[in-house]
From Swiss-Prot:
Keywords: ATP-binding, Isoprene biosynthesis, Kinase, Nucleotide-binding, Transferase. One of its GO terms (biological process) is terpenoid biosynthetic process. The active site is at residues 8, 134. InterPro entries: GHMP_kinase_C_dom (IPR013750), GHMP_kinase_C_sf (IPR036554), GHMP_kinase_N_dom (IPR006204), IspE (IPR004424), Ribosomal_Su5_D2-typ_SF (IPR020568), Ribsml_uS5_D2-typ_fold_subgr (IPR014721). It comes from Caldicellulosiruptor bescii (strain ATCC BAA-1888 / DSM 6725 / KCTC 15123 / Z-1320). Catalyzes the phosphorylation of the position 2 hydroxy group of 4-diphosphocytidyl-2C-methyl-D-erythritol. This is 4-diphosphocytidyl-2-C-methyl-D-erythritol kinase. Pathway: Isoprenoid biosynthesis; isopentenyl diphosphate biosynthesis via DXP pathway; isopentenyl diphosphate from 1-deoxy-D-xylulose 5-phosphate: step 3/6. Belongs to the GHMP kinase family. IspE subfamily. Its EC number is 2.7.1.148. It catalyses: 4-CDP-2-C-methyl-D-erythritol + ATP = 4-CDP-2-C-methyl-D-erythritol 2-phosphate + ADP + H(+).
Length: 286
């Protein structure tokens, strides 16, 4: 079985509070983009999970999200057959694009079908939560408001199709470290989530671009000023709006046309290796 595992971007990301368990309560609008890993899954006779990948930058053992997803399903539902999973990696790793979470979501969907478990979307989302906060959204895809630690997913009207340029600087960002460094009392600019939802419902690309905002950006930029350099180049080449996604370091810009996006990509190529021009999309859904 071959599945597409789509990346996500955060159009808006607000952090509300820190919980007693150490996690943070957030409100974010997530959006699927037409950038995906390809996941090949096949049954094998021996009771084992084998993960291989085209990338040297991700683990293939029980630290891999796809492996964890397979292990959880097998254990919970007493599946004795094994699986071989191959991940053809196209989504930049550790970028804020949910690369690991979306692979896990694809494996949950695929194994639900292969092993005829007949689990509902809701049941898969509950299992997905145990793997990572972005997994439930990745199961649903499209455009959604996510709350809690990101695991509560409220579907929104689909955003209009937009030209999205993604650039990932070659720096490593720890999500945990970014959240720990965030001082909630010093956040000066928060996203207007309601204005973003209205812009999405109206299909107003310029208003969507105007309302892009991520409160984590100030923390990551403080450590890696290259993020601001990427944003400046996008803006100087007519991006309608630009923002960091997730905890970074990937940045995306919304462009009114592909010509401007390609111009920005040419400028960025001087110091950024991973640059992707794509569009928003619905993803694979359930």
């Amino acid at each position: 079985m071959k599945l597409k595992a789509y990346a996500k971007i955060n159009l808006a990301l607000d952090v509300l509070s820190k919980r007693e368990d150490g996690y943070h309560e957030i409100r974010t609008i997530m959006q699927t983009v037409d950038l995906y890993d390809i996941i090949n899954i096949e049954k094998i006779e021996e009771d084992n999970i084998i993960v291989t990948t085209s990338s040297e930058n991700i683990p293939t053992d029980n630290k891999n999200h796809a492996y964890i997803a397979a292990s959880l399903l097998k254990e919970r539902f007493g599946v004795k057959q094994g699986v071989r999973i191959h991940i053809e990696k196209n989504i930049p790793v550790s970028a804020g694009l949910a690369g690991g979470s979306t692979d896990a979501a694809a494996v949950l969907k695929g194994l639900n079908e292969i092993f005829e478990l007949n689990l509902s979307e809701q049941q898969l989302m509950e299992i997905g939560r145990e793997i990572g906060a972005d997994v439930p959204f990745c199961l649903v895809g499209g455009t959604a408001l996510c709350e809690g630690i990101g695991e509560k997913v409220i579907k929104l009207k689909s955003a209009p199709q937009m030209n999205i340029l993604i650039a990932k600087p070659e720096v490593y960002v720890s999500t945990q470290a970014v959240y720990e460094a965030l001082d909630l009392s010093k956040i000066k600019k928060r996203p207007n989530i309601e204005a973003m939802i209205s812009a999405i419902e109206e299909g107003n690309v310029k208003e969507i671009a105007k309302n892009l905002c991520n409160v984590l950006e100030v923390v990551t930029v403080n450590q890696y000023p290259v993020i601001n350099r990427v944003k400046d180049i996008m803006r100087n080449n007519n991006a309608l709006g630009t923002v960091m996604t997730g905890s970074g370091p990937a940045v995306f810009g919304i462009f009114g046309n592909k010509y401007n996006a390609l111009k920005a990509a040419e400028r960025l190529k001087v110091f950024i290796k991973e640059i992707i021009l794509t569009t928003t999309c619905e993803g694979s859904g359930f």
